[in-house]
Amino acid sequence: MAKVIIFSGAGISAESGISTFRDSGGLWEEYDIQDICSAGCLDWNYEQTVEFYDKRRFDIKDKLPNKAHKQISKLKEKYPDDIAVISQNVDDLFEKAGCNDVLHLHGFLTQIRCMKCNYTEDIGYSKLKDKWDSCPKCKNKLRPDIVFFGEQAPKYEKLYNEISNCKMLIVIGTSGNVINLDMFLPSYNQKRKGKGIQYSILNNLEKSDAINDKMYSKVLYKKATDAIEEIVQDIEKFLN
């Protein structure tokens, strides 16, 4: 198990120009989110859902990792067994920065999956049907390898296992509305006092009603690219 968990959300990728459904304008405004991001939408709205994710895939093609992605990648390379990088994001900016073994909790945009046999393949930034009309193994429908709202997220189990056993938690660029990690902090959970997480850092642009920042050892309300050097220094100090 890793000693340090770096957990990131949409905020870390926003500085690279990747918008989220909470942002106004852009691709998300062209669609009703419930029609293309909710459980079951592939059953009754398959073509439009595939079209939307084809556009999202193309949209990230030219997006580049920022300073935060790059610094985290270097740190992961230096301490491969001591650091785990876990992301709520479905983009490939960590991978573009050279970061290996990223746990993408909500799927991976450049990857497709068979709806029956779970065959997966990375198709890069291609349109799904430009690559395959159907699963090459069982000939059933393919889908974006993304966790839709209301679907089970199988990688959550690994997330909770990793965080339950880590010693340092870094949270970057997340509102806490989807996944709130406060419960893992000793200051929140009396049963965890004296064990588990010893030091924690929260880095967001601003306060979130879903996160109790008083639970964290250090809070940095600034851009991830502005905070990352201090975060890296704290991690290095902790590991050494």
Question: At which residue positions do the language-model features occur?
Answer:
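Conserved catalytic core of sirtuin-type NAD+-dependent deacylases
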Residues: 1-240
